[in-house]
């Protein structure tokens, strides 16, 4: 059966998400995937440069010293930190930890995740530099 009534279609502007801060932050957080793609491509390029020998590796290192590449890598670092912060704030909402018949607040878990991140980063950096 078909109807003769015209369906109501609510108009929505293309910039609807810019009206509320929550949606702007959501778009910013989701936009952190673009620098992650850049870093993934950069790592793949580095692996192939390493595979091609010393000359290829020297070319890769000189590519990394380009000011534009340095800027993109710093931007990627900030994007990764923002993404990490939002995921660490989300983790306590996904897990209910009960200690002495009381639900634990989110702060200890968030702090523990940051401590693990800093310790793991320090270990990786120490191994890379030694």
UniProtKB/Swiss-Prot annotation:
GO molecular function: succinate dehydrogenase activity
Any Gene Ontology CC annotation: fumarate reductase complex
Transmembrane feature ranges: 30-50, 60-80, 110-130
UniProt keyword Cell inner membrane present: yes
Entry keyword annotation includes Cell membrane: yes
Pfam families membership: Fumarate_red_C
UniProtKB keywords: Cell inner membrane, Cell membrane, Membrane, Transmembrane, Transmembrane helix
InterPro entries cross-referenced by the UniProt entry: Fumarate_red_C, SQR/QFR_C/D
Localisation: Cell inner membrane
Membrane topology type: Multi-pass membrane protein
HAMAP family in the record: Fumarate_red_C
Function: Two distinct, membrane-bound, FAD-containing enzymes are responsible for the catalysis of fumarate and succinate interconversion; fumarate reductase is used in anaerobic growth, and succinate dehydrogenase is used in aerobic growth. Anchors the catalytic components of the fumarate reductase complex to the cell inner membrane, binds quinones.
Subunit structure: Part of an enzyme complex containing four subunits: a flavoprotein (FrdA), an iron-sulfur protein (FrdB), and two hydrophobic anchor proteins (FrdC and FrdD).
Official protein name in the record: Fumarate reductase subunit C
Organism: Yersinia pestis
Record gene name: frdC
């Amino acid at each position: 059966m078909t109807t003769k009534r015209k369906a109501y279609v609510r108009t929505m502007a293309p910039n609807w998400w810019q009206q509320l801060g929550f949606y702007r932050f959501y778009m910013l957080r989701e936009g952190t995937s673009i620098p992650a793609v850049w870093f993934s491509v950069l790592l793949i390029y580095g692996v192939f440069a390493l595979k091609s020998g010393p000359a290829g590796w020297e070319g890769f290192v000189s590519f990394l010293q380009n000011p534009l590449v340095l800027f993109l890598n710093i931007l990627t670092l900030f994007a990764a930190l923002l993404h990490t912060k939002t995921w660490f704030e989300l983790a306590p909402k996904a897990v209910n930890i009960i200690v002495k018949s009381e639900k634990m607040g989110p702060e200890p878990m968030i702090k523990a995740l940051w401590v693990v991140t800093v310790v793991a980063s320090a270990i990786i950096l120490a191994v890379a530099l030694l």
